Amino acid sequence: MVTEIRIHYEGDTELREGFRSFLREIETANEGHPPRLIAGRGREQAIADFRKALRIHPTAVNVLLIDSEGPDDGRLFETICQPQQIAEALKDRVFWMVECMESWFLADVDALCQHYRKDLREELRAIPKSRRFPRRTY
C-alpha cells in the first residue's frame, strides 16, 4: 500500500513553491495529500537522498527528478543513474529536467522580472544568446 509520494529533486528548497503549484493535480489525485518534496542541492545529494528513501520509506512512491545537463540521447539513465547504483527496475521512477524545460522559465523575461525583481533583467541578459529560445505559444 502506498503511504505517500516523495519527490527527490535536484535543486534548492526555493523551488518547492513552484513544484507544489506544478504538481497540484497529484495532490488532488492523492486525496488531498501533497507529495513530499525533498530538495537535493546537487545531483549527487538528490540521488543519495533518493537511494536512502528507497530503504527507509519502502511503502512510499519515491521519485527522482534531476537535470539532464543536455539533450536526451536515450541513454540518460544508463550514463547517469546506473553508475550511482540505481537499479534498472527503478527506471520508471526517474524523471529528467531537460534543456527545453529550463527554457520555459526564461521565455517570458517581463513576467519573471515583474514577479521577482526589476534588476533580474540585467542578470538574464548575461545568459549567452545560444542558450535563449524564442517565445512560442503552443
Q: What is each residue range found by the language model?
A:
Residues 1-59:
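RecA-like P-loop NTPase motor core
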Residues 74-138:
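Activity-critical C-terminal alpha-helical subdomain
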Residues 11, 68, 109:
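Residues immediately flanking
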Residues 14, 69-73:
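Short acidic, S/G/P-rich loop/turn micro-motifs used as interaction or catalytic elements
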Residues 6, 61-63, 104:
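Residues embedded in well-ordered beta-strands
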Residues 8, 64-67, 97:
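Conserved beta-strand segments of the P-loop GTPase G domain that flank and frequently precede/overlap
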Residues 52, 60-64, 72-84:
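A glycine-rich, hydrophobic loop/mini-helix early in the fold
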